[in-house]
Regions:
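Specific aromatic-rich, kink-prone transmembrane helix
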Residues: 106, 146-163, 176, 340-343
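Membrane-embedded architecture of ER/inner-membrane glycosylation machinery
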Residues: 2-8, 171, 296-575
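Short acidic/glycine- and proline-prone juxtamembrane loop motifs at membrane-interface regions
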Residues: 93-96, 132-146
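Extracytosolic helix-loop segments that constitute the early lumenal/periplasmic catalytic or substrate-binding loops
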Residues: 25-30, 43-66, 73, 80
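Transmembrane-helix signature of polytopic, membrane-embedded enzymes
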Residues: 15-21, 107-129
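Transmembrane-helix motifs of polytopic, lipid-linked glycan transferases
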Residues: 94-114, 152
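Transmembrane-lumen/periplasm boundary regions of multi-pass, lipid-linked membrane glycan transferases
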Residues: 47, 176, 188-330, 339, ...
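Membrane-interface transmembrane helices that cradle and orient dolichyl/undecaprenyl
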Residues: 113-114, 153-172, 180, 348-351
Length: 575
């Protein structure tokens, strides 16, 4: 069992409660102040909404069509909070925020048990100031919840084998692995921890306790039993109904979205070194800088600290696992961040103050420069908005409204290293991160929200058509379902555009009173886009309305039979 390190923590104890309180505020700040934003948030919110409206939770649906891309746990959580609160605008962000809070507690408690209070606090602060962590904890993507399950799995295994035995936590780790798999297929990653544990964890610890016993095999059995709670009803229902749609759902969720997606990814293709050369240097700053500057300290501790070896080896295995797949995204490596933060905190707290000076000077200087950059950006937004990037034109009004907040944030970031120079580096970085997220949650989100939803387009649609008119969509987006005031018809999200267009053409021919909502960038063969009626812009696309006058005489595209009609049970749920 590793001995706790006394370390030489710089921060005064009186600051710790304030930083904890500010972290709690930052995690939940802004909830209820914005709607789900593309690309992924509207999808998960709409799926959860349909679960509550239909009462059918086993097979997630999107606009009435089965959604086979992700297992259901994350959508279940949003749906549960929607039922509890009655407010989807609140419910869709709660799972990630609570997962972030849970991850912070697990890291703190594990660090305290392995190396003491100082390391535990530093590990929490590292997570707080590493951009990727709060970025995911404050969004409605799957990855923050996945990160919690994986961290819980690692926590249980490490607590049992390094500071145990703790058979209850060992069992909890395998349940967490199962829930992680039911959230996203890579939830099995904590099991990789068994490799370094087998190498460096002896069968008996110094106290004579035996961590490796025959009953350890019950862990994987418990994982399979937990998985069966979802897989068995799903599989049996598919076999009983045996419809093509459910068969396709089962095969997609179990095979195409797991092994096939890993081995033969069809999007986000990147070179093998992508995480080392692109993702880590951007999403894990300044953690990566601290690691590079403390390589020598890691090497010095490697032989004497089994906990450090085990955690860093697991992080390396996770990076290797994702690097071997051709499909790569920055967010995939988020689950490795908590254990990496713990390892860095261990090294940092055993680093003499003199050896920390280079990192402290460098990162404090970067913080000042970031503040100066934000001040300059605010000045440009006020005085010369035409010099901003072209995409800023989409948010011209918002940019002007945000300028005061950007200025204040810039002054705060630049002032922290100067006014609080006696405080510890990690405290300064964490405070800067938390102030940034408070500004984002209370200022940026409400200001940008009208520009990130299709509410204006749908309001114009209601003004142009009669109440009973049937509306169809090509290349439909979930956010339109969230804001719709009437039933919407779509022609399968999964179908290629040519098939959707052909289905829409036949649907409109059957009743000339029907209309079609489409983005105007589509190259359509069955419709005359010169007969369009402009509705407005949403998500950097111009949306138009086509009626029967836009139908061409013939449509030779592939005939599709999929047609889904979504009827909102409760309207204006995001008001």
């Amino acid at each position: 069992m590793p001995r706790p390190h006394t370390g030489n923590l710089e921060q005064a104890p009186s600051w710790w409660p304030w930083l904890v309180g500010l972290t709690l505020i930052a995690l939940f700040a802004g909830i209820g102040l914005r709607a789900p934003w593309p690309a992924d948030e509207p999808r998960f919110a709409q799926v959860a909404r349909e679960m509550v409206e239909s009462g059918q939770w086993l097979f997630p649906t999107r606009g009435g069509e089965y959604y086979p891309d992700k297992p259901p746990v994350f959508m279940w959580l949003i749906a549960l909070f929607y039922q509890l609160t009655g407010q989807l605008k609140i419910a869709f962000l709660l799972p990630s925020a609570l997962a972030g809070l849970g991850t912070l507690w697990l890291v703190y408690d594990l660090g305290r048990r392995l190396w003491g209070e100082h390391v535990a606090r530093s590990a929490v602060l590292i997570l707080v100031f590493t951009p990727q962590f709060l970025l995911q904890a404050k969004g409605a993507q799957i990855d923050a919840v996945l990160c919690f399950w994986i961290t819980l799995g690692c926590y249980g295994l490490v607590r049992h084998f390094l500071v145990g035995p703790a058979w209850g936590w060992y069992a909890a780790s395998w349940v967490a692995i199962a829930l992680g798999i039911m959230t996203k297929g890579v939830g099995f990653l904590p099991a990789l921890m068994l490799i370094p544990l087998a190498i460096w964890r002896r069968r008996f610890d110094e106290s004579g306790h035996q961590a490796w016993r025959l009953r350890a095999w019950w862990g994987p059995v418990l994982m399979l039993a937990t998985l069966a709670l979802w897989l068995a009803p799903m599989w049996l229902t598919v076999e009983r109904v045996h419809s093509p749609e459910l068969l396709a759902y089962r095969d997609n969720i179990l095979f195409r979205q797991t092994a096939e997606r890993y081995a033969s990814a069809w999007h986000h293709i990147q070179p093998w070194h992508y995480y080392l050369t692109t993702a880590l240097p951007t999403m894990w700053l300044p953690l990566v800088v601290l690691f590079v500057l403390r390589i020598r300290g890691i090497m010095d501790l490697w032989s004497s600290d089994a906990g450090l070896r085990i955690l860093l080896s697991w992080v390396a295995l996770v990076l290797l696992f994702f690097s071997l797949s051709p499909g790569k995204r920055e967010v995939y490596i988020l689950p490795a961040l908590p254990m990496c933060a713990l390892a860095l905190a261990c090294v940092w707290e055993q680093t003499p103050a003199a050896s920390r000076r280079a990192a402290s000077v460098l990162l404090r200087t970067v913080l000042v420069l970031m503040g100066v950059l934000l001040i300059a950006l605010a000045g440009v937004a006020w005085l010369a908005p035409h010099r901003l990037p072209a995409r800023a034109d989409d948010y011209a009004e918002a940019v002007a409204a945000l300028a005061p907040g950007v200025l204040l944030l810039g002054l705060a970031l630049a002032g922290i290293p100067l006014l609080l120079r006696k405080r510890a580096l990690f405290e300064q970085l964490a405070l800067a991160s938390l102030l940034t997220w408070l500004c984002i949650a209370f200022w940026l989100w409400p200001t940008l929200d009208p520009h990130r939803t299709p509410r204006a387009v749908l309001q114009e649609l209601e003004r142009q058509i009669a109440p009973g008119t049937q509306v169809g969509m090509l290349e439909f987006k979930e956010q339109f379902l969230l804001f719709a005031e009437r039933p919407l018809v779509h022609f399968s999200y999964l179908a290629p555009l040519a098939q959707q267009e052909s289905s829409a053409w036949h649907w409109m021919r059957a009743d000339p009173a029907r209309v079609l909502l489409v983005p105007d960038h589509l190259a359509l063969r069955c419709f005359d886009l010169t007969r369009q009626s402009v509705l407005g812009q949403a998500h950097r696309r111009d949306w138009v309305l086509l009626d029967a006058t836009a139908l061409r005489e013939r449509c030779d595209g592939p005939i599709g039979h999929a047609l889904y009609r979504y009827v909102p049970v409760r309207k204006d749920i995001l008001s």
